[in-house]
Structures are given as structure tokens and as C-alpha cells.
Amino acid sequence: LDMGRGTLYYYFKDQDELFRTCVETYIIEPKQKVLNSVTEDITVEGMIQTMTQYLNHLKEALMTFDNKSINTGNVNSIMFTAYGRFPALHRKAQRLALKEVDLWRKAIYNSQRAGLIKHGIDVDQIALMFAHIKNSYDSGLGRTQMNFQLLEKTYYALYNLLKKK
């Protein structure tokens, strides 16, 4: 938030308000911004690029913290804690999650129409698989920093399985 400790105490009445603001600023708002930028003609490859953009923003935000072992498990724990404390934030995150799955579904259909990927696949299941790649605990095992390259690599691995040969 680019504030000193004294400034934080001035602007935020308690730790809960500060926590909620940090979650919104570093996790919710960037995701909302990239999802809102998606156009109707998005393809799977375009959606991968969009989600990579979000992950790059998240990576930059996490690099500003002193703790270099922040990983997927930590981020998910933070989100679950925030959801328990702030129901409105939880509803906002749920809407974003549903929107993301819908955008993946749209991207898959658009890619099928463009002849880029196979027909006859379970679009709903594949959309969920794409949406959950970034939540993978594998990218944060061993108390090491989140491996953002692994996430992008996984997106493309799934996409390559769907491509027409």
C-alpha cells in the first residue's frame, strides 16, 4: 500500500480493515481488472495470456513483501481467512470465480469454432480445469516461493492436449 506504519494507523481503524484492503488491492482488484478486459472473441490462448498477466501482477505484488516464501498455499489461506471475516468480499470473489469459468468456457467454444481445438470435449470440465490451475498447491510446495512459470507451463500443457493435430 506504499505507506509507513504511522500512516497505516491513521488511515485504517483496525487490523481487519487493513487486511481487507490489502486483499482487495493485491488479489481481488487485479483479477477483476484483467477479467473485465477480456473481449467476446477470446480464444484459449488469449485467455492463457490474460491469466498470465494477472499472475504476473500477483508476482510483482508478492515480491514487494519481505517474506520470499509466499506461495499458493499462503495465498489460498489468506483468501479463506478473508472470506470468513468479510462476507461481501467472499461474494465478490465468488462472482469473479464464476466469471473466470464462464470466460474459459467462452474461450474454449471460440477456439473450437476457429478450428484451433478438438470438438467432442467436455467444455464445462475443461473450463474448470483451466480455472483451477492457478490454485494448484504444487506451485507452492516445500515452503518455497510460488513458481509462476510452472503455472503458465501448465496452462499451455492443457491447451496442447486440446489442440487439433
Each language-model region and where it sits:
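Well-ordered alpha-helical segments within folded domains of soluble proteins
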Residues: 75-79, 134
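Helix-turn-helix
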Residues: 1-25
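Residues in soluble alpha-helical coiled-coils and helical-bundle/repeat scaffolds
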Residues: 13-17, 21, 38-42, 84, ...
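Hydrophobic alpha-helical connector segments
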Residues: 21, 35-70, 123-130, 152
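C-terminal peripheral helix-coil segments that are non-catalytic and often amphipathic
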Residues: 53-61, 102-114, 129-139, 143-165
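Amphipathic alpha-helical packing segments from all-alpha helical-bundle domains
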Residues: 71, 77, 86-114, 125-128
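Hydrophobic/aromatic residues within well-ordered alpha-helical segments
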Residues: 15, 22, 26-30, 51-54, ...
